Every structure is written in structure tokens, then in C-alpha cells.
């Protein structure tokens, strides 16, 4: 079990003095993850699965070990894990890989990241698929009763984020997944903001597919991610890419492809990144996923104190139990980008501002953007307190109703 101090000591980026509250965008990389990647470059920097020399054998072994480490985090088997460069790629594998018929329906929510909306919009144009969005409550929650009105027998796929990246609300994915199954639909979970932050069990969720990046909750490197496919669902998907590394044999006009999951990983992959992601999965397990979730709840509860500041409006539910480690807000009379810039300039506090790649969610709130603060296990109470103090000063000096 790693303490907060242990983890902070492991993250070189924090030694710059930054108060980093932009974890929903990307997280800093711990030194053990960097070391695993450097070890690849320094000791066995070879391609995988292409050759018999010892360097390529070791590279292949370490690459494949990462599959099992990822699987352990979400209670899957290694054979159900496809390596991707991010969650976006995983979602697009579903969009381009399933067999669609005119009139099929995809159900998402109004709160989705653009990566879980735009691929379905393309299917509307190219395949005659219909996209329906489940409405949210004023607090940006998706109620099962609202989902029940949208999901029907015409629904081929339900695609829902576990935690809203823009607002931080935790959605009832188990209940939504049951609605999908009851109507004969497939169920895809965008777990970009939950894996590594809280327990995620694909067996309990009952999903057919799950997409996640490596560079957020898992503390892994950018350009990595994974796609979980329930073992009996591989036959329903075509690979997104075809090429080297996924064939058993090739004739002039035909080829025989390898079995999943490798058939979905054409071309030379991000070998050091995936090895780093495997080490990152070990790292968050060493901390303890429950321990991470508990600490993030505590820090989020502290961040929610900003709702008491005059001129500050916080979006989403007051109940921290319905939130991940994300708090989205605005200061009346001050543009969201200006607030983020002032937090940076005054106190080296890093937050995100804008529509957070969730423009429909912003329209639901009636704003063009928000300021978003987001935590991880390593953040300190003192850092959150500093953020609150500086925000209060900004609101006092520049805010208005």
C-alpha cells in the first residue's frame, strides 16, 4: 500500500511546485512507470512478435504481460483486452466494426464526450442509423426512468459514460446495462473517468464493451488505452485496421487473420507505452483502488466548499456520492478561461476551462463552458485549500451576479 507521500515522491512533475487539478484531462506519470518504459528502450528495444532473438522475445513477453495487468484492474481475462492508443479509438472500433442495418438505433446521453457522440453521428449519415440521446436532470444525472423511455427493441447499441468528464456525475450504468440487455441491445461503457479512480468490474456492470485510456486514472503514459470486449462478442466486430502483425497467411487475393484480441492490433504498436501502462496498472493496485476512491471522495467533498463562495456556481449534484473527483463551476461575470488563467498566474493552480469536449452537456447547462477542477489520490488537502482561497479572492474581486 502506497501512502500519499509515497506517490507524490514518485511523481517528478509535482516537484515543479504546481498544484495540479487537471487530472480529468491527463495525470502526471510516476517514476516507476517511466522506469519501465526506459528499461524497454535501454535493455530490449525490439519489435514484438517478429523474430526469435532474445530482445524481441522479452519485448513480446512484457507487452503481453501488460494485457493481464489491465485485465486484473477491471476483472476481465487477458484474452478480452485489446490495446489501443486511447478510449476514442476503442469507441470507433465499435462504431466501424459492428454490422449496422438501416433503422438501427444507438442510444447515448446528452452528457457524453464528443468521442461517444461523433462516431454515431457519422453512422447516421452513412448507414441510416438513428442516434437518440437520453436527457439529463438539471444536476446532470441520468435517471434509469429516462433511459427506459429511450431504449427499445430497435436499439442495437447503448453507449454511456460511467462518469461525466465535464461535470463528474456518476451514472447508474448497471441499471442502464440491464435495460440494454432486456431490449436485446449491446452495451458499451466509456470508462475514461472511472478506471483507476474507482472500482470498475465488467462482470458486475454486465457490459459487452468498455473503453478506457491509460493516461487518466491509471497514471499511465499518453497514447495508450485499452478496449475490453466480452469474450463471446468478438465475432460481432470487424477490425478497425488491417495490415502487418495480424495475419496467419496471405495469398494474392485472400488472407487468413489471427484470432482476437491480436487481430485488432495491426501494425507496430506503442510498445514502450503499453509496457508503461502495464506498470501503471500494477502501481494503482499497489495503492489500492478502494483507497484511491475514498481519498478522491474526501478531496471532492472539500472542493465542493466553493459552492458557498458568493458569485460561484457549481454544476451537478451536491451529493458527493454521485460524483467522481471532478467539480465544474463558473464565476458570475468572469469568463471561464479568465478564471483558469488567473488561478494559474496567481498560485500555479492548473485547472481546465472550456466545453471539455462535451458541447451538448454545456448546452444542457445553458453555458458555453465551465472551469473544471479534478483530483487524484496524490493531491493534498492543502492544495485544495489553496485553490479555494484563490478562487474566493477572484470571485470577490471580479465576480458579479
Features from the language model and the residues they span:
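Pyridoxal 5′-phosphate
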Residues: 1-401
